[in-house]
Amino acid sequence: MKVQASVKKRCEHCKIIRRKKRVYVICKVNPKHNQKQG
């Protein structure tokens, strides 16, 4: 999981999820796209 200042969808399978005041991008098709804002 990459930690980035701004998270963006990188493909059509990515989903933006908010958990515990953090923003995540989760992608089951391509796990390289997983990101966390921090």
Swiss-Prot record:
**GO CC aspect terms:** cytoplasm; ribonucleoprotein complex; ribosome
What does the sequence similarity comment in the record state about its family? Belongs to the bacterial ribosomal protein bL36 family.
Which species expresses this protein natively? Thermotoga maritima (strain ATCC 43589 / DSM 3109 / JCM 10099 / NBRC 100826 / MSB8)
Q: What is this protein called?
A: Large ribosomal subunit protein bL36
Q: Does the keyword Cytoplasm apply?
A: no
The UniProt entry, under InterPro entries, shows: Ribosomal_bL36, Ribosomal_bL36_sp
A GO molecular-function descriptor:
structural constituent of ribosome
Give the GO terms filed under biological process for this record.
Answer: translation
- PANTHER family, sorted: 50S RIBOSOMAL PROTEIN L36, CHLOROPLASTIC, LARGE RIBOSOMAL SUBUNIT PROTEIN BL36C
What UniProt keywords are attached to this protein's entry?
Ribonucleoprotein, Ribosomal protein
Coiled-coil stretches noted in the UniProt entry, renumbered to this chain? none
Any Pfam family the entry gives: Ribosomal_L36
